[in-house]
Amino acid sequence: LNSTLPNAIIMNYGDNDTFPLWYAQEVEGVRKDVRVMNMSSLGAEWYIDQMRIKSNDSDPLPFSLPRSKYTYRNETVLIQELFNRPIPAKQLNEWIASEDPRTMLPMTSGEKMDFLPSRQIAIPVNKQNAIESGIVKPEDAHLMVDTVYLNINPNKHYLTRDELMLIDLLANFDW
């Protein structure tokens, strides 16, 4: 906790990693500005709801998807590749958040299901914020890329709720 930047987010994958950090924050008062996020719980809507509210001195996580898009009926988002090019993550979030029937796939049951129209996701890098926050040293600025690209495996046919929320977080986290 003490080695992180102010208002950092620590992502881990289990209770054995999470509970000692929470203990340090809640009982010993260590770095209450840092948000500890247990990725194995990020698939639960109640946990996403908790991450969306202020906790101690930690701001809410900047998720943009409305609750209706990650509740019990939306455990997965299908991948139907309409575009063979990178789509900005914020634009993908807007696509998923939309209730426009054109952004959904019809199912045999008659229901419509959200889907991602590309396997390639582009996440712009705010270089100035990365330098000002201390993530990147000013003398290394020339080494920074403008965009980080995520490529979803061609054998993967859907994203789980936790994967979708991680993309949402990356889309709205201004480095």
Language model: regions and residue ranges:
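ER/secretory pathway lumenal C-terminal domains and tails of membrane proteins involved
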Residues: 1-7, 23-175
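Short periplasmic/luminal acceptor-recognition loop of GT-C membrane glycosyltransferases, typified by
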Residues: 8-22
